[in-house]
Amino acid sequence: MVRLREIPRTATFAWSPGAASPLIATGTRAGAVDVDFSNETCLELWDLGLDRQSTGEELQPIAKFDTDSGFNDLAWTPSEDNTRGIIAGALESGSLDLWDADKLINGSSDDAVISRTSKHSGAIKALQFNPRHSNLLATGGAKGELYISDLNNVANPYRLGTAARADDIECLDWNKKVAHILVTGSSAGFVTVWDVKTKKESLTLNNMGRKAVSAVAWDPEKPTKLVTATPLESDPMIYVWDLRNSHAPERVLKGHESGVLSLSWCSHDPDLLLSSGKDNRTLCWNPQTGHAYGEFPVVTNWTFQTRWNPHNPNFFATASFDGKIAVQTVQNTSTDTAQAIADQNQALDGEDFFAKAQTQPQVSSFSLPKAPKWLERPCGATFGFGGRVVSVNLVEKGQRASKIKITPFEVDEAVGQSTETFENALKEGDLRSICETRAANAATEEEKADWKVIQALISENPRKGLAEYLGFQDQSADEAADKLANLGLGKEETNGESPKESRGPGAKKHKRLQSMFDASPEADNFLSDLAASKGAKTNNPFHIFNGSETEADKGITRALLLGDFEKALDVSLKEDRLSDAFMIAICGGQKCIAKAQEHYFSKQTESPNYVRLLASIVGKNLWDVVYNADLSNWKEVMAALCTFAEEKEFADLCDALGDRLEEQIRASDDKSLRKDASFCFLAGSKLEKVVAIWIEELRENEQKALETAANDTSFSIHVRALQGLIEKVTIFRQVTKFQDTERTKESDWKLSNLYDKYIEYADVVATHGRLQVAQKYLDLVPEKHPEAEVARNRIKLATRQPTAQKTQQTTTGRGTPLNKPLPTTNAYQPQRTFSPVATAAAPSPYAPPAPTTNAYAPPAAATNPYAPPAAATNPYAPPAPASNPYAPPGAAAPPQPTNPYAPASGGSYAPTGYQPTPAPSYGAKPLGGSVPPPPRASNQSPATVTTYTTATNLPAWNDLPEGFAKAPTPRRGTPAGAAAPISSPFPNQSPSIAQGPPPPGAPPTQRTPSVPPPPKGTAPPPRVTSPPSAIPPGPTPPPNPYASLPQSPPQLNPGTMGVPAPIPRGPSPYNAPPSMPPPTNRYAPSPAAQAANPQLQARGPVPPPPQAAASPYAPQPPAASQYAPSTPPLQQGPPPASTSRPGTASSQKVTPAPATPKYPPGDRSHIPEDAMPIYEILSADMQRIKGRAPTSFKQQVEDADRRLNLLFDHLNNGDLLKPNTVSDMADLARAIQARDYEAARAIHVDILTNRTDECGQWMVGVKRLISMSKATP
């Protein structure tokens, strides 16, 4: 019941029609006195602004129109000719006024009045537009006048009924299903149903003695049902009528304490009815059942009108004479029940202690028992992972049965189609066609260039392809000669002589070549002369030494004669004879050539640039070109790399050149170089570098597309850009055979940005139903990537194939298992009943020998090697029942085989079978209220059991006590009303239920505490010695035969009269399987803590362990005789050793019975001096908290105080807490006193962790005290 808005007016009101933001029209209530005694009457329009957060400011009207009279009623209807509809006002003066709402809102008040008619001789009390024909308006008023007006002819309405009536029509309502039916209610008690079509009365209801009628309302769905209300203070009734029986009301709704003034039946849900009246209250009813759901916040004066919002029934408004119109919701956001649960579960940490309580308004609230009809969806749909939509539709309208349909769904079909096309092209392996298609359809030059470069990489010689892409292609010899001849040569430079005569085609020479080898005509015959035959003689003799040689000439000659080309080279280089040096080097081999080249390049400091390039090429040092060449010549550098770079250095050289281009981009902000850098990174297969550029281009292209897009959505634009990136990366990886070496790393990935895009793209294609494609790209992401791990799990769950599952074991009426998920016992083998003590029953000299094991019984199942150790036997459990000397043969059952599927004992949770207690005999007193009622049937199919390792709703150690939470409803194999087989000679005696091992997969049950709760009281033993009757079962459903026990049976006190063990049944093939032993509660308070709590000591007589379920075909046991011995001998075996904590001294000895406290609870006179600060500080702080805590936390504060008193009792008795713990608790108390809550928490955690045996319920109180004290200023 959240009050959304308040209109500060005493006025009648009407909601605006339509789905727009709701407006309310108000008209000053006739006869009402304002706070300032103003006589002003007006029509006002209010914008509630429910779409904006309330600022606490008082609402102001958006339109106002003064009138000459007050209003009794208002109505607002939609209209085709008027944008915001027409408002009709019923004035006290008898005038019917119509306004155009749109003109009122726009400020045209002078033109807003549509019409003003005065057909009524007195005040108009009520009016309403026809819900099916908005042009028809019914008005009723004084002297029984009832008019029907047509808005197309308002001046000429027609009247219904006779002209002479002394009563007034107080209310009216059009039928919601039959358009021409109208009902009116008068002050004389007449409820008349009119047929407007025939202009006659249809019938008149006997309104229970002609009591005045203040309100009427039709059922929104049933045309024959309506409700009426009486304004009498002595008899405030609401009558529900069915016109098929108009003599008496169908139902009477009683709840108002004074007269009812207004009714409003929700048009969206016929189960909701609002009523308001003179008792200042507004109630919500279910008129179909007569049940009152609850009441809304009470006001200070009469509530004379209440109305549902016609379009959004979540809101309604109520007008009262306290000068306010309250707009509120039908449901509260936080009910008292929810608040109580929240209070119990609140952690009480920090400022949350008060924050939550202070935000809850102290108002009445209630919660609807079922969802309103407009929230009951007849259909629904939800998006499922993997491009699926799950929809739910009714099989047939009006039925509750639904059908579920799963259909594929794609946000953008183009995305799915392009994904399929690309994946198919990849499977075919035609990468070149993909590149050509993408390059042809590229939106930008950069994208086109990328695809061209990738296409070049696909060629047989990628380097040659890259050089050709840059424009460096191989040339023929003639083309090279032509270009060389045209390098700036106009005339031959021949020292002023005319050019030599051409020597035929192909004789074009460079001027330098010509000057070097064209010195004399004899030079042409030089080579031919050298090639003379062996015997030929020439006429060109020469001297090796002619006497004019220099020393250098002589040295070179001698070296050549001796074949010492290296020495000859040294002399030539020393004399700077480079031409001779190169000729000698050619003869001397590669070593000499390298030496000559090195000397040559060292001398060419002022030589042309190509010499330095040649030096880098010859010296295989292209790094000089990469790092030092001007970036305007990056293409030439790249061509040189493609031509001369070694394979192992090529990628790094391209990477270095690309880095230089990126630095230039950052320095000059010239993004045109980005394409050049991308080329370098592509050529060098540097995926991490090129991906960064592509992602940046993706964002820019996406932004441009958003600015120019006409019909595309932002999602489609983004996905197309993302898909283009993924396609380029995928093709590039395949072409370059890229290997990601960082997939095993856990962080700091170089391709982190690409991994994010892979994950995003996988999510997109998965949304379009391509789960396999999504899985392929997720496999490219490192395994340790957190987001990829989540995405992989989703894909894995969505694509997993259903596996054959073992069906749950079910039992037929004869107890034969249909399936075998569990090891079964022999159907003809006697079953053993539950015994909390692991010792066997003592043999009886009168009992026959136990039957031998059936040779055909299945072998015992092996013990589960992975199960935890069995729970320690409860030291307070009764011993095994003694063998009955009168038991029939076969009563003693052999040991049952171990169930490998049963949950291991010793955990905090182990389900056991339901174990009812047999009715006491021999005059034993009846059981307390804590004993569960007997079951109604014993042939229920076993429920599945979830082991403690897989259960998800296991209770925690500090949860609510057992019994506070509702147990889950058990599943039944048979109806609840099925009769149980008779297992007792007395018809009213409680039957017992067989105890069997729970099958796997059953719902989790509650834990069995090791110490049972105290009995609710003891009663004297009954005097009747006849067989007692069973405890009558309550209205609760039959208990689950596999639910856990609410408590473990305590041990009988020595000296107390025992209850004889029930007679065991003989072997039967229909007995249920044996039960599991109950586990001990490792979270129960220690024995010392139990000793300090007097509530845990008193125990009433305890029933014996339950017996196996009786078979309807087994022989009936003999009736308990009153002459039987009152106390058969009890035999008890030695107590078993505890196994709950192996290896510790405390767990290997039997815990003694709790000792009686030395001093009564509440006594504080014996607290030692070293512990006195604990008591003084903690109790004082607790009193401070009590005085400042909000009332909503009263329960938590009292619980903390009670637990602290347990601590003080231990301190007073000097038990449980050891001296070092007392010292630590004193330090904790001083820390709380000093407001050092972190230190207090640290001490608390240390005690709780390392000294568990000294902790009890008081530790929870200390923890809560720390939290409360910190939250309390």
Curated annotation (Swiss-Prot):
This protein's assembly is summarised as: The COPII coat is composed of at least 5 proteins: the sec23/24 complex, the sec13/31 complex, and the protein sar1. sec13 and sec31 make a 2:2 tetramer that forms the edge element of the COPII outer coat. The tetramer self-assembles in multiple copies to form the complete polyhedral cage. Interacts (via WD 8) with sec13.
Q: What name appears for this protein in its UniProt entry?
A: Protein transport protein sec31
Q: Which family does it belong to?
A: Belongs to the WD repeat SEC31 family.
The protein's matches in Pfam families, at most eight in alphabetical order, are given as: SRA1, WD40
Q: What is the lineage of its organism?
A: Eukaryota, Fungi, Dikarya, Ascomycota, Pezizomycotina
| Annotated localization | Cytoplasmic vesicle, COPII-coated vesicle membrane; Endoplasmic reticulum membrane
- Protein's UniProt keywords contain Transport: yes
Q: Which organism is it from?
A: Aspergillus oryzae (strain ATCC 42149 / RIB 40)
Question: Spans of the WD repeats?
Answer: 5-47, 66-109, 119-159, 164-204, 208-251, 255-295, 298-338, 382-407
Gene Ontology MF terms in the entry: structural molecule activity
Q: Which GO terms describe its biological process?
A: COPII-coated vesicle cargo loading; endoplasmic reticulum organization; protein transport
Main subcellular localisation: membrane
Composition bias (Basic and acidic residues) maps to 490-503
